Amino acid sequence: MRLTDAISIRSRRRKLALFLDEMRPAEATTVLDVGVDEVSLGEGGGQSGCTTHNFLEERYPWPERLTALGLHDGTRFRERYPRIAYVQGDACSLPFPDASFDVVHSNAVIEHVGGRERQAAFVDEALRVGRRVFLTTPNRWFPVEVHTRLPLVHWLPESLAGRAYDVVGKSWARDNHLLGPADFRSLFPGAVEIRNLGLTLVAIT
């Protein structure tokens, strides 16, 4: 296992432990996981190199109470996780009625949905369909950018960072919109607790 994958898995274990401790789900708790991937834990990581996809789906004790939402058609996801309901849809326009779930969970998705307007819509939708939310995102002020594995480049102005990504063959990183603690908090219209775990920020309502 690569060191970066080991760090990622450790981070996700920490977030899962925090999720279980803060949300205290029980067997009857309904959970929506927004932004799942078609590939599963340990499979190829695509552009980001990440091999820790769908960590909640792999570890959650009551999969029958999970609903997963993703952009893909879900064929491989359903094969891998037959006990979990899968819905294809847009995280910024969720196809569910108000208060459909006890908890909305999303791990490191909000930085991929677009700029601040789309990110605000993402938060609004999570708050609309969930009685509580648990959202995570990489911390912009951590010195290593988790998607590219590059140090400090993401602290540059976006135009300069974009050029640097182009030079090293990571132009796809231009589409990542990272958040610092104040940025993350500003997306919530009401009370929210922002936990700074160093590498990761967690928003809890």
Question: Which functions belong to the PLM regions below?
Answer:
Residues 12-17, 47-54, 178-181:
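Well-ordered, non-membrane alpha-helical segments in soluble/globular domains
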Residues 29-142:
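Conserved SAM-binding loop
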Residues 168-190:
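Short alpha-helix
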Residues 1-27:
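Class I SAM-dependent methyltransferase Rossmann-like catalytic core
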Residues 190-201:
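Conserved S-adenosyl-L-methionine
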Residues 204-205:
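Active-site beta-strand termini and strand-to-loop segments that position acidic
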Residues 2-6, 107-117, 170-175:
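Surface-exposed cleft-lining segments at the edges of enzyme active sites
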Residues 132-159:
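Conserved class I S-adenosyl-L-methionine
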